[in-house]
Amino acid sequence: MSSKFIKPGRLVILLNGKYAGRKAVVIKTFDDATASKSRPYGHCLVAGIDKYPRSIVRSMSRKTILKRTAIRSFVKVVNYNHIMPTRYNFEGRDESAFTGLKNTVTVESSQVAKRAHTRLAVKKIFEAKHKAGKSKWFFSKLRF
């Protein structure tokens, strides 16, 4: 698959592996020419949602609302063949959240030793965006 459609900020759906069916944001792309020996194929760095926030109603307690709106995130390097690009982007006109995400998630921070800290930072960015009511499609579970 060409990286013509897969650009940073594009929302994608993962097709294979542990996070199959989960939505993610492309942070950085690596084409065949720039690939290292360990990954001699087109791939990209993505940050996505492992556990989606659930719906809430006004009558729920504050504690229940906090528990139900919690998001679990993941950071992963994925082959282009294992993702499906969507028509959506992470940001519309406001680029601040994606810039924060791009600064937080780097190739070095996606390594196993630093991944836990990176996941927490991504979780905070996603929760802030969810609380603001942006990208409703991204924060809803994919039904299949």
From Swiss-Prot:
CDD domains: KOW_RPL27
GO CC, any one term: cytosolic large ribosomal subunit
Record-linked InterPro entries: KOW (IPR005824), Ribosomal_eL27 (IPR001141), Ribosomal_eL27_CS (IPR018262), Ribosomal_eL27_KOW (IPR041991), Ribosomal_eL27_sf (IPR038655), Translation_prot_SH3-like_sf (IPR008991)
KW Ribonucleoprotein (keyword) present: yes
Pfam family, one: Ribosomal_L27e
Record-level Gene Ontology MF annotations: structural constituent of ribosome
Disulphide bridges: none
GO biological process terms, semicolon-separated: translation
Ribosomal protein listed as a keyword: yes
Keywords: Ribonucleoprotein, Ribosomal protein
KOW domain mapped to chain residues: 6-43
Protein family according to the UniProt entry: Belongs to the eukaryotic ribosomal protein eL27 family.
Name the UniProt record assigns to this protein: Large ribosomal subunit protein eL27
Organism annotation: Dictyostelium discoideum (Social amoeba)
Encoding gene per record: rpl27
